[in-house]
Amino acid sequence: MPAYHPSQTPQAADNGLDDYIGMNQAAKSAAPGFMEKEFMPTLLDAYSIAVKNALSIVLAILLWILTLWIPYINIGTTIALCTMPLALSRNKPISPTFIFDKRYRQFFGEFFLTGGLMLAGVLAGALFCGFPAIVILISWSLAPMLVLDKGCNASEALTLSNKYTYGNKFLIFILFLALLVSLGVLLGIFGFILGAIADALGFIAILLAIILIPATGVGLIAAIYKRLVYQNSSPS
């Protein structure tokens, strides 16, 4: 496996992981309100990513659970799992075993520092009737992926995430609500149809829900990251 070089470009990479780990690409962001015109394309893209990668996402989660007890290995797998939307945002299929790539472990210091700062910020926001916690969570939601994607430290990642989501936080919140409602409706209709055919088929709807709920959630984060980060204007 090739060594990691921060100055390496995606074009010179030898495998898919190099395309989205530590490439130090120039920071880019969308304009405030950008997600308004991208609302439906983002939602549809989330479903597209989820359908294409649902099995890989679920298997990766299962592999993470099965290996969570292994010291040191669990550091890399946890980082890989938490930043999975970064891989999916490049429109490339993923393998469930990608979580075992050793290069994820080299980011553990900045990643967990970023996570700790995010948790502290959300808890502080929760003291003020809860709503600020949601704002902070959305504002900093891209930070863990930015640590890997841009090779920045925790402070820089949080700052960049806030800039990328500026002016789009409310629409991101509505996107998650829309995903939750639409997925609930789709699963409800599917379950009703199966139940009308035979009561025993209801487990298929439950199985589908177990697969699609995490897959669509990860897919939406990937679709949002794709649109907010990979744009032409620099964050200000």
Please annotate each region the language model reported.
Residues 56-57, 107-111, 172, 199, ...:
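Residue-level signature of transmembrane alpha-helical entry/exit and packing/kink sites
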